[in-house]
Amino acid sequence: MDELKKLAGVTAAKYVKNGMIVGLGTGSTAYFFVEEIGRRVKEEGLQVVGVTTSNRTTEQARGLAIPLKSADDIDVIDVTVDGADEVDPDFNGIKGGGGALLMEKIVATPTKEYIWVVDESKLVETLGAFKLPVEVVRYGSERLFRVFKSKGYCPSFRETEGDRFITDMGNYIIDLDLKKIEDPKQLANELDHTVGVVEHGLFNGMVNKVIVAGKNGLDILEK
């Protein structure tokens, strides 16, 4: 599957042209996209400026000598390539399994062409089997946890090595085990209006193109 993920990442990189501002995604498939951009910068003289979606991707891009700018310094991104944890037929998705959902959404929002690279296991009829990440400020997070629990959202604080996971922005993540999300837009609206929630992993209708790596090769889905 890694070879197919690599092929998907390399294929996505073909949408990147000279002079573009490029959003550099985070995750196992987006990794190969960033590697291919680095190769083209070195071997082909590709001239681009990258905007990263996590500290991990920043380190990777710097190691490849890809010129970078902060999201604060740009108004429009030409193309962003990132991964996703689930994608439904309406191009709604769940992201944030790697904990970078806030930065990923900040980069995705001003992007003209937003592309996801995924393996075929990420294609689902209904979102929700993958736990929905909700990034929350630390202050009041226990109360927010109880609110989610009272709604039957089966929350859990994300942990790493026995301690609470802390995002690149210094927040906690509460994962919601919803099993099935019948109305992603309604849930997104609810979370958007919940005090203490910084961001959530529902990316509804944002993506333009999904490059799928499967056992039979690549499939490119478009709106």
Curated annotation (Swiss-Prot):
SUPFAM superfamilies associated with the record: D-ribose-5-phosphate isomerase (RpiA), lid domain, NagB/RpiA/CoA transferase-like
Biological process terms in GO annotation: pentose-phosphate shunt, non-oxidative branch
Reactions catalysed: aldehydo-D-ribose 5-phosphate = D-ribulose 5-phosphate
Pathway(s) where this gene product acts: Carbohydrate degradation; pentose phosphate pathway; D-ribose 5-phosphate from D-ribulose 5-phosphate (non-oxidative stage): step 1/1
Keywords noted in UniProt: Isomerase
Catalytic site positions: E104
Pfam families recorded: Rib_5-P_isom_A
The gene coding this protein: rpiA
Annotated binding of substrate, by residue: T26, G27, S28, T29, D82, G83, A84, D85, K95, G96, G97, G98, K122
Family from the record: Belongs to the ribose 5-phosphate isomerase family.
Protein name: Ribose-5-phosphate isomerase A
